[in-house]
Amino acid sequence: MAAGQREARPQVSLTFEDVAVLFTWDEWRKLAPSQRNLYRDVMLENYRNLVSLGLSFTKPKVISLLQQGEDPWEVEKDSSGVSSLGCKSTPKMTKSTQTQDSFQEQIRKRLKRDEPWNFISERSCIYEEKLKKQQDKNENLQIISVAHTKILTVDRSHKNVEFGQNFYLKSVFIKQQRFAKEKTPSKCEIQRNSFKQNSNLLNQSKIKTAEKRYKCSTCEKAFIHNSSLRKHQKNHTGEKLFKCKECLKAFSQSSALIQHQRTHTGEKPYICKECGKAFSHSASLCKHLRTHTVEKCYRCKECGKSFSRRSGLFIHQKIHAQENPHKYNPGRKASSYSTSLSGSQKIHLRKKSYLCNECGNTFKSSSSLRYHQRIHTGEKPFKCSECGRAFSQSASLIQHERIHTGEKPYRCNECGKGFTSISRLNRHRIIHTGEKLYNCNECGKALSSHSTLIIHERIHTGEKPCKCKVCGKAFRQSSALIQHQRMHTGERPYKCNECDKTFRCNSSLSNHQRIHTGEKPYRCLECGMSFGQSAALIQHQRIHTGEKPFKCNTCGKTFRQSSSLIAHQRIHTGEKPYECNACGKLFSQRSSLTNHYKIHIEEDSLKADLHV
């Protein structure tokens, strides 16, 4: 009879307000843009999860605003003409505002005790209290926290003006599942009314808690769901069922394939709302957001210094290791220094447990660590059979071999041009977008990437770190040094398929191939004249602008081209490098030698006529 009464008792239904995170206007306006973006993501995901559980309720106004990309606040005028906040206008929401005010008092108390505080709705706390009371009445209810916990952490990166202290926010959404036990402890009947769509839990009638009961026999890692275990086991078996149709690269998981396909399509769905920069992976966006928030969440417990990256903390800790070598003993596993990290940082370390002792970077697998360590050791086991060039990774060799085969699997959607690597395609796309986010502090020139900015700045500093060991000549870029070294070795790895002519660099081959194709992609906007090379277009545009950037230090004469300046300087130096093979006469310019040859040709033709 008691059991029947227990079954008839109404359930505590989960509503949106139970999991909603509410802010007052003062709290909201003090949040950084990156914090607001993450709050928006959390709230929308909470709403989607509730909808997927089959709960029926009208869409909250705050969700409609967030879906439209607006702030969860609307300033409206009431009948008295006084401004009020739109999403707090109803009596129900006004009550929620009062709850928030009392909640702020609790926050102030927590801050005085230097405790972290959580923005969780008051109704959620009341809901948990109800469940606790029912448990105390021996109703044998259990709450299972499963599947999704989302944490918004902005550790000491946002100053709260009102409270006068730094704080971090946690927005935690926990899906709460209720299971009613029967008298027999080995069986349980799942309450199906509230969670009809949660099919993966309905099929598991023996679950009592969210324990990880599916264990991998190879590495003993445990999982909550059997499907997660099966995905994980593919890492050991090497099974890769998901294949890219573009380049035939295979992956063990469909999510990895989807991410990879963005390299071909160029899709970048993760956009920074601060600067508009787009990324193909959410992890890349998270890293980028740190540049705006200046978040430094890795703190040294020895001296209190903070770092935005784990590798920075690790390198810093080596200073303390020299002072106290017995205290710090960095090893192969990242857990060897995890004692110096906070709880949230240790969560990241569980995912990346292999640590590089040289630079502090962490990796998910020992194989990834071995690949990385070749950067430090200089080991290059993968050699090209065509030209003998060696590489540290097989992927780099495959990419290099495309130079010899002519394969270009990465194609630009705008102009159809093909490329051997995704990095080259991304660099090319900037031509169409015109995006230049990096400015030089010296001359104000805008550049498309941080790496090109660093190389450009060396023009002003005069730094040339790449030095040739044969002749001692120095260069600003490593690529320029590699091309130069081919002059000494005689290596010409780039071959034209039309005429078999070989070249030292890929750009020279590309320019040469336009002779065969007749392609002239560089067009002057002033007169419409087209050119096969960008350098030729730049030189031509100086005719319209009148710019003459090359100046003779001796007489002050200026020139449009560097070659014209070099030829002119020979007037002052008296240098004559061009010699006639027929009579030995010397010339300062090649064009003068060419004209001189015509004299000998005419003489030869006259002699031939006389003999006839």
Swiss-Prot record:
Q: Specify the cross-link site (Glycyl lysine isopeptide (Lys-Gly) (interchain with G-Cter in SUMO2)).
A: 150, 175
Question: What GO biological process term is on the record, naming one?
Answer: negative regulation of transcription by RNA polymerase II
- Compositional bias (Polar residues) spans? 80-102
Q: Name one GO molecular function term.
A: zinc ion binding
Keyword list (alphabetical) reads: DNA-binding, Isopeptide bond, Metal-binding, Nucleus, Repeat, Transcription, Transcription regulation, Ubl conjugation, Zinc, Zinc-finger
Q: Specify where the region named Disordered lies, as residue ranges.
A: 76-102, 320-340
**C2H2-type zinc fingers: which residues?**
214-236, 242-264, 270-292, 298-320, 354-376, 382-404, 410-432, 438-460, 466-488, 494-516, 522-544, 550-572, 578-600
- Superkingdom is Eukaryota
What the entry lists under CDD domains is as follows:
KRAB_A-box
Write out the GO cellular component annotations: nucleus
Q: Which SUPFAM superfamilies match?
A: beta-beta-alpha zinc fingers, KRAB domain (Kruppel-associated box)
Record protein name field:
Zinc finger protein 354B
Task: Specify the species.
Answer: Homo sapiens (Human)
